[in-house]
């Protein structure tokens, strides 16, 4: 950090928090100590929406994320990108909805919840093939390069450098372009949507249901 700042870069730290996938009790205490050791340099944390983490946050109101959130730390909820281990970690659409509504009711400043509530328009959460950077670089999902056993977990033939097949499959499935929430919907993770063993309990898009919940709560 000092080296970056000496070069004129305003550098901060971001860390990730995966309570059910990464820590036993002693390691969690070490993690907490490290967070507070670097408190003045901490910009935010990313939390991972796995099945076990969602269950944990829904049942444990005293979790460390709760503490950090209420101390003003920026929190971003990131989607679980499935691989060959995903059958025990990939949440259902109902579990996604349950955690989204829990965050709306209790942690409305967690992104992307905050963006859904506050913004009229949002960028997609995935680095989709429709995004082109200033230097002309076409953005692609960083996880498209998969091992053969991982690629077998998807409905669509995953291309090494081409998001379009999985984007098209999701956008057409829910007819996103006609949705009243399309401009402020971040669409989630296209690879997670394409996971072969994803359990879909709802007949409707979980993001559409979540945006409707936000409106019904009077937050828009």
What are these regions, as identified by a protein language model?
Residues 143-220:
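Flexible mid-to-C-terminal extensions adjoining Fe-S/redox cofactors in radical SAM and related proteins
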Residues 7-139, 143-152:
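Radical SAM enzyme [4Fe-4S]-AdoMet core and its adjacent flexible, acidic
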């Amino acid at each position: 950090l000092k080296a970056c700042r000496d070069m004129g870069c305003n550098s901060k730290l971001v860390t990730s928090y995966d309570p059910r996938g990464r820590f036993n009790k002693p390691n969690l205490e070490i993690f907490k100590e490290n967070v507070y050791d670097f408190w003045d340099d901490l910009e935010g944390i990313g939390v991972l929406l796995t099945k076990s983490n969602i269950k944990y946050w829904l049942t444990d109101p005293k979790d460390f994320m709760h503490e950090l959130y209420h101390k003003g730390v920026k929190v971003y909820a990131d989607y679980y990108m499935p691989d060959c281990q995903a059958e025990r970690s990939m949440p259902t659409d109902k579990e996604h909805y349950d955690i989204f509504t829990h965050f709306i009711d209790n942690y409305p400043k967690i992104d992307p919840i905050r963006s859904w509530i506050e913004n009229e328009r949002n960028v997609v959460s995935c680095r989709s093939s429709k995004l082109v950077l200033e230097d002309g670089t076409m953005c692609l999902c960083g996880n498209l390069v998969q091992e053969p056993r991982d690629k077998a977990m998807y409905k669509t033939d995953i291309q090494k450098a081409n998001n379009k097949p999985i984007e098209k499959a999701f956008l057409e499935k829910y007819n996103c372009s006609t949705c009243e929430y399309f401009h402020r919907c971040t669409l989630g993770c296209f690879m997670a949507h394409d996971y072969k063993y994803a359990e879909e309990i709802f007949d409707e898009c979980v993001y559409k249901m979540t945006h409707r919940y936000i409106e019904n709560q009077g937050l828009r």
